[in-house]
Amino acid sequence: MSILLRPSSSPSLCSSLKLFRLSSPDSLIDAAVLRNRTKPSQSFRMEVVSSNSTCLSSISVGEDFPSEYEQWLPVPDPESRRRAGVLLHPTSFRGPHGIGDLGEEAFRFIDWLHSTGCSVWQVLPLVPPDEGGSPYAGQDANCGNTLLISLDELVKDGLLIKDELPQPIDADSVNYQTANKLKSPLITKAAKRLIDGNGELKSKLLDFRNDPSISCWLEDAAYFAAIDNTLNAYSWFEWPEPLKNRHLSALEAIYESQKEFIDLFIAKQFLFQRQWQKVREYARRQGVDIMGDMPIYVGYHSADVWANKKHFLLNKKGFPLLVSGVPPDLFSETGQLWGSPLYDWKAMESDQYSWWVNRIRRAQDLYDECRIDHFRGFAGFWAVPSEAKVAMVGRWKVGPGKSLFDAISKGVGKIKIIAEDLGVITKDVVELRKSIGAPGMAVLQFAFGGGADNPHLPHNHEVNQVVYSGTHDNDTIRGWWDTLDQEEKSKAMKYLSIAGEDDISWSVIQAAFSSTAQTAIIPMQDILGLGSSARMNTPATEVGNWGWRIPSSTSFDNLETESDRLRDLLSLYGRL
């Protein structure tokens, strides 16, 4: 292997360079020698090149290196930079209207994140959640959650008057029904004023609606919502046959009768997009990348399934043959029955996975990078008969593998994804992840069970990996610690080299930052040292989830101690 020294402004490599190549003592060395230089250059970088380069010339072993030799230093690959970030969903921000939003608190958080030295903000899926608030069981894979729209930002855009805003409410946790009742009428009013207007904002709305990368999912979503609002059925499976199967005449009739609803739906999505892109652009200016999150599956009662039935495993009547889930695991003795329809991967392959290509393109529009939940489902997926009551009766089936990601790369170019590879991880999952270069995950709460070969222990981490103190599905560090028995605590304290447990949250945070993993992500709850009451989600439960908000006594302006502590640790472990 040869080492090429390349000046940043050299007009001709061959005219100014020779190449050094160390070989056996009896052989010659191909050397890169800068001619006619009297001062060392600071602008060299070292690269590996093939030994048969046409620029090579030879000198004998033992001859002097040029005076610039000590300047031939390797330049770090920017893609290998160590970094850290915080997991905090926008619903968890403080705010006056019952739910966090994309207003001032989002910008304050980015400023605070920048002050800590963190360079990643991870969010949960931004899609409309289900009635319980879960963003992993929403009705659309591409739409934004309009409850995240800031009413104050609508005032700034001239779409609402300040006097129209409701009286502030002090809600310690998110109540989605209350937030919807409080905010939705005003968001609708703002959307109507936008449609009726004629200014620059109206022009941007039309551009948004006509963008092919947007319209390919937005029109279906708008029609689906209009029909659903009109019929109020349990699912699209119960709709009249012409609507259920998307007869053109039936859709035209819906447009005529529901034009205002459809136009308002699209305008609301534009308002979400506008506010989110403002937040994202501000984060970019502050050196913060936004990491999104994408559930692998979509809900049955969704525009995605209704408009793309051929891409899902449905019977002739449109009902799921098989549904999603996972076998028994750490979270459930009978497995988790998610109930989403499964993809017909063979049908998807026949049109080059166009549905997935469009979905990833949408993710690129929203995020700088994206975690894909349940990545293992691309290698092999757990299929449960739709009539089953528990997931444990399912079977493993072969997934699309690398062919899906080849099609995505061909369709949208280079993508940055993080593979959520927790649970039952077989060899084919590891091979698939490595074949596409995606980092996997390690979770420190899983590290202290088993022996020294536990893959979640820091000494077993990989460089191309994202380490978490815990995810949205875990308890907080403090809450998790309180559930451990004394033997487990003693083992963890010995590994973490701590004598006491008073500061256990920060001890685990430090362990995450010290990991060899390139990226470390810490939930905001752990930075605040909160207990189980701040847990975001408990898998296999249906109530009491997705409601956590930053305590009213906490402001990003008074988190200087936490900011300084984070920055010190990031500096210590090379993550600034």
UniProtKB/Swiss-Prot annotation:
GO CC annotation: amyloplast; chloroplast
KW Electron transport (keyword) present: no
GO molecular function, one term: 4-alpha-glucanotransferase activity
Subcellular location: Plastid, Chloroplast; Plastid, Amyloplast
Chief location: plastid
EC identifiers of the protein: 2.4.1.25
The protein's enzyme class: transferase
Catalytic reactions of this protein: Transfers a segment of a (1->4)-alpha-D-glucan to a new position in an acceptor, which may be glucose or a (1->4)-alpha-D-glucan
Keywords: Amyloplast, Carbohydrate metabolism, Chloroplast, Glycosyltransferase, Plastid, Transferase, Transit peptide
Annotated GO biological process: glucose metabolic process; maltose catabolic process; starch catabolic process
Gene3D superfamilies: Glycosidases
Result of knocking out the encoding gene: Increased amounts of maltotriose and leaf starch.
Pfam families for the chain: Glyco_hydro_77
InterPro entries listed in its UniProt record: Glyco_hydro_77, Glycoside_hydrolase_SF
Domain of life of the organism encoding this protein: Eukaryota
Transit peptide feature range: 1-45
Family annotation (NCBIfam families): malQ (TIGR00217), PRK14508.1-3 (NF011080)
Similarity-based family: Belongs to the disproportionating enzyme family.
Known function: Chloroplastic alpha-glucanotransferase involved in maltotriose metabolism. Probably uses maltotriose as substrate to transfer a maltosyl unit from one molecule to another, resulting in glucose and maltopentaose. The latter can then be further metabolized to maltose and maltotriose by beta-amylase. Required for normal starch degradation in leaves.
Protein name (database record): 4-alpha-glucanotransferase DPE1, chloroplastic/amyloplastic
Chain's gene name: DPE1
